[in-house]
Amino acid sequence: MWTLEDFVRESNRIEGILRDPTEDEIVAHKLLRALPQIAVSDLEIFVAVVQPGAQLRRQLGWDVRVGNHIAPPGGPIIEAQLGDLLAGDLSAYKKHCVYETLHPFTDGNGRSGRALWLWQMGGEAPIGFLHQFYYQTLDALRQ
């Protein structure tokens, strides 16, 4: 069984952050994981810890590109779409994919998306994020 610290460490390493998780990062994950529901404001608080200075892309012109992916344009619709996504009844896999496609923040989307996935998994990542997500992806493709 992976500890929360293991999960945060792996999530950070995916982003090229090779240091151990900070206490603030661990606490932010614990607080998010303990919520009965996650609202946009909860993710804003989380992202402020894991990526200080990053903001929800609610302003026109706050556009992002990640590799070949161009996220939807920034503006008020991003907040509405994120709220709808959080309220929706999607699988952890599907919600994570839609979240990463939306890319709602100026930075910190990968780590916040993985934290959201962990929350949807009931706070447990028994065999690690990448392994579990890999099999969820295969299952989704087979449906």
Labelled PLM ranges:
Residues 1-143:
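FIC/Doc superfamily catalytic core
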